[in-house]
A protein has these predicted regions:
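Active-site neighborhoods of divalent-metal-dependent phosphate/nucleic-acid chemistry enzymes
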Residues: 2-13, 82-128
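Short, hinge-like loop/turn segments at secondary-structure boundaries
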Residues: 64-67, 102-103, 145-146
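Short, well-structured N-terminal submotif of metal-dependent ribonuclease cores
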Residues: 1-49, 58-75
Length: 146
């Protein structure tokens, strides 16, 4: 559950982060490790992909009960109100390059993950994910696992 206090004025270093959907789910459910990392780097250094927003809403709509659905929607809305949301830039070059390179090397990566990677490369962001294997074969992509 979201219940943390993060000081948006605190930023350590110049690195900026794009939080993958799985990290956002951990954050929504109160994972202290993720919360502490965000506190350490400063919330203003972190952003969310519009792709992850779509994935979060998809997850909420697949909940088993209306009560849980309402709780998840409230958590998502609270989360989204605290972070900058990154839209899809004019990045077909990054996406096309990533997909072609991976295909040529026999790697299959989720389409959404490729788009998130393309955003990160375009904006110079580090992807924070707990699914490093989804991204590790993408050339020049900076990754962290919180």
């Amino acid at each position: 559950m979201i219940g943390w206090q993060i000081n948006s004025a605190v930023t350590m270093g110049n690195r900026r982060y794009l939080l993958d959907t799985n990290v956002l789910i951990e954050l929504i459910h109160g994972n202290r490790t993720v919360i502490n990392h965000i506190i350490d780097v400063g919330i203003s250094s972190c952003a969310i992909s519009v792709i992850s927003v779509h994935e979060l809403y998809y997850g909420a709509y697949n909940t088993p009960s209306e009560k849980y659905f309402i709780q998840e929607m409230n958590r998502i809305k609270m989360l989204l109100s605290r972070f900058k949301i990154i839209s899809l830039p004019e990045m077909p070059d990054d996406y096309g390059r990533i997909k072609t390179s991976l295909r040529l090397h026999g790697h299959i990566v989720d389409e959404f993950d490729m788009m998130i990677a393309g955003q990160a490369l375009f904006y110079g962001l580090t992807v924070v994910t707990n699914n490093l294997k989804h991204f590790r074969d993408i050339e020049n992509l900076k990754l962290e696992d919180w």
